[in-house]
Every structure is written in C-alpha cells, then in structure tokens.
C-alpha cells in the first residue's frame, strides 16, 4: 500500500520513509498539489496523501477537497507543527487523520500507520 507525500523536498522524508517500509507501506512523492491529477489518483489510488508543511490553511483545504473530489476513499494527513486541535479545526469535515509532526521520524511513520489501522485502512 502506498503513501503519496506531496512535498517540495523529498529528501527530508528519508527516515519517515524507512518507518513506512518497516510498517509494510511504501511511499512515492509529488512536488506540488498541481501534480495530483484526478485521473492518476483514480488509476493508481494511494492509501493516503500526506501534505508537507508548505501546504497549510486555505491551500491545504482546497487541495484536500480536490483529492476528495477525485476519490473520497483516499485518506489524508498533513505535516505541521500545529497542535492536534488547531489542525483539526483547519481541516474539519475533510476526514483528515491526525497530523504528522515536523520531525518526520520513523516513529512518526509508525504512528501514522497505527492511525490507518484504527480507521481500518490497513
């Protein structure tokens, strides 16, 4: 199962990617929200789209809605230093999983995998 990470800097996700692989997941990267086309999301549906920290606030909501419109079965999360409640308020109603901290460690990846288990995605 694949996690699609939308980030301008894939290199900063190395440890996180190792944690995903240890949890039986793989990851791929897109450089920007515009790289996510509805057709490609439908043809090669990722388990989760993970938005990196540059995509926040209204831009994150808009990008998240775009993914939902392509395929509402795709889970989403974002990498941010916001507290859980603040993050939840910004993406309320979009079904985002808990945010990933900026540390992007293997442990953070395992926590995300556990969240996917809780929503029965794995």
Residue map of PLM features:
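Two-component/phosphorelay signaling modules centered on CheY-like receiver
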Residues: 10-30
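Alpha4 helix (beta4-alpha4-beta5 surface) of REC/receiver domains from two-component response regulators
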Residues: 80-100
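C-terminal output helix
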Residues: 86, 104-114
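Conserved phosphotransfer microenvironments
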Residues: 46-71, 81-84
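Conserved acidic carboxylate
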Residues: 7
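Acidic, metal-coordinating helix/loop segments flanking the phosphotransfer/catalytic sites
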Residues: 31-48
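The C-terminal output helix
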Residues: 114-122
């Amino acid at each position: 199962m694949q996690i699609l990470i939308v980030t301008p800097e894939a290199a900063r996700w190395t440890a996180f990617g190792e944690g995903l692989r240890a949890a039986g997941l793989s990851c791929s990267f897109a450089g920007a929200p515009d790289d996510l086309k509805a057709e490609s999301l439908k043809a090669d549906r990722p388990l989760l789209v993970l938005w990196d920290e540059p995509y926040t606030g209204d831009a994150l909501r808009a990008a998240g809605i775009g993914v939902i419109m392509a395929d509402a079965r795709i889970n989403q999360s974002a990498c941010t230093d916001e507290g859980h409640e603040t993050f939840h308020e910004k993406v309320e109603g979009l079904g985002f999983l808990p945010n990933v901290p900026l540390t992007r460690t293997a442990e953070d990846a395992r926590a995300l995998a556990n969240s996917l288990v809780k929503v029965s995605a794995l």
